[in-house]
């Protein structure tokens, strides 16, 4: 009966998930901060093991609005990061994610829709749909993570948080006209149009 209602049980985690929303960003003109936020999770290698880093990114400014570093890949970390971003910055028009189990979990979907926000999801395996976050992951890893060998989760969490603060406030981006994400967040920049 769950399949008939658009609900499936995720076989990997046992988390009840939602019917997948469609991708809403195709040909969307993104011309202001707080219009579209993207969430994604990546793994960060440590000296022994790894942690998961989930971030909320404003697509217009590339600013990382909130993040969570955790030892498990659960919906609660995405929910908490999104709740922190909404509390600090208001709500966007659209939240875009991939189809990871933490984002298809009913808990996360309810959080997004409960704020009156539209939920958009990339096509399965379509990394280009979330290219802004993928670029940020590359930057975080090459400029910080790969230069470290984190001993503890606490050390990773603290160091990544320091880097994200620097990334937002001091690191200029060529794609942002040499401005930092913070400068664009505050002052705006020319309109971005996503490719078809």
Walk through the language-model features, giving the residues of each:
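Single conserved hydrophobic/aromatic residue that forms the stacking wall/gate
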Residues: 1-18
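An active-site-proximal beta-strand-loop segment
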Residues: 30-65, 71-73
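Acidic active-site catalytic centers that drive phospho-/nucleotidyl reactions
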Residues: 40, 58, 82, 98, ...
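Active-site beta-loop-alpha junctions of metal-dependent nucleic acid enzymes
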Residues: 49, 67-89, 94, 101-104
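Short small-residue beta-strand/loop micro-motif enriched in glycine and branched aliphatics
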Residues: 61-67, 119-122, 146-147
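Buried hydrophobic side chains on well-structured beta-strands
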Residues: 62, 95-98
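RNase H-like two-metal-ion nuclease catalytic core shared by retroviral integrases
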Residues: 97-99, 103-112, 119-141, 152-161, ...
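C-terminal domain-tail junction helix/linker
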Residues: 113-115, 139-196
């Amino acid at each position: 009966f769950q399949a008939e209602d658009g609900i499936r049980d995720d076989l990997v985690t046992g988390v009840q998930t939602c019917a997948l929303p469609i991708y809403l960003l195709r040909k969307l003109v993104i011309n202001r901060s707080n219009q579209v936020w993207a969430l994604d999770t990546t793994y960060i290698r440590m000296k022994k093991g790894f942690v998961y880093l989930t971030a909320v990114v404003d697509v217009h400014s590339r600013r990382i609005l909130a993040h969570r570093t955790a030892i498990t890949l659960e919906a609660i970390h995405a929910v908490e990061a999104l709740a922190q971003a909404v509390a600090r910055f208001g709500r966007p028009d659209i939240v875009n994610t991939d189809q990871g189990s933490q984002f298809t979990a009913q808990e996360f979907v309810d959080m997004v829709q409960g704020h009156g926000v539209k939920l958009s999801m990339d096509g399965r395996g379509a990394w280009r749909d979330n290219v802004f976050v993928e670029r940020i992951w590359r930057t975080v890893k090459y400029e910080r993570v790969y230069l470290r060998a984190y001993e503890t989760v606490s050390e990773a969490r603290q160091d990544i948080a320091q880097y994200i603060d620097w990334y937002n406030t001091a690191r200029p981006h060529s794609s942002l006209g040499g401005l930092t994400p913070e400068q664009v967040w505050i002052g705006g920049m020319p309109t971005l149009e996503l490719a078809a």
